[in-house]
Amino acid sequence: MAVVPKRKTSKQRKALRRSHHALEALTLVECKNCKQSIVPHQACKYCGFYKDKKVIKVALNDQVK
């Protein structure tokens, strides 16, 4: 058999425990090469540059969705 809680968890204790569960807004910066919004410390998925160097090949997608 499972263990049963000794006392009821109060609303305040529940709220304090869940206070760290909120979602944070994503931090975005402008790419120095193509001026698109990107996540910092990652290669740009639009042009493939990171720290002024081409690090990944990016396929051109001319189709408009």
From Swiss-Prot:
Keywords: Ribonucleoprotein, Ribosomal protein
Single biological process term from Gene Ontology: translation
Cellular component terms (Gene Ontology): large ribosomal subunit
Pfam families the UniProt entry points to: Ribosomal_L32p
Transmembrane portions of the chain: none
GO molecular function: structural constituent of ribosome
Disulphide-bridged cysteine pairs: none
Record keyword Transmembrane present: no
PANTHER family: 50S RIBOSOMAL PROTEIN L32, LARGE RIBOSOMAL SUBUNIT PROTEIN BL32
Protein family according to the UniProt entry: Belongs to the bacterial ribosomal protein bL32 family.
Xref: HAMAP family: Ribosomal_bL32
NCBIfam families xrefs: rpmF_bact (TIGR01031)
Name of the protein this chain belongs to: Large ribosomal subunit protein bL32
